[in-house]
Amino acid sequence: MLKYALAFTLFAAVCAAPAAAQQAKQDFVLVNKTGYDISEVYLSAAHADTWEDDLLADEDDNFGDGESKTVHFEPRVKTCLWDLKVVYDEDDSSAVWQDINLCEVSRITLRYNAKSGATTALFD
C-alpha cells in the first residue's frame, strides 16, 4: 500500500508541474486592508513614463476593503522591478510605490492610517 501511496504522490507532483511552470515569477496577491474601496490599480515597469491599463477596468465593482486579488503576469515577462499605483474610490486620491521586486514578493497588503493620512504597503 505504501508503494501505491508513494507512486500516487509522485504522479500528482508530475501532473502539477506544468501548471506551476505556467505561473510567472512576478504573480502576486494584492490585499486591500485600507478600510476603503479602491477604484483603480495600475502597474508599470519601474520608472516608466506611463502606467499600464487599469487592472480593475474589466470588473463591475471596486476592489473592496478586505478583498484580495491575484495579479497574473504572462510567463514571457522577465522584468522584476515594478511600480504600483492605487486610486481610492471615495476621493480619487492615490498612493504610489516604486521599485517593487515582484520576483521576490508574492503578497502586497495595503493599509491606510487615518491619523497620518498615509497608505502603506507590506511586502511579503
Question: PLM ranges: what are they?
Answer:
Residues 5-15:
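Bacterial N-terminal signal peptides
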Residues 20-78, 85-124:
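Intrinsically disordered, low-complexity segments enriched in small/polar residues
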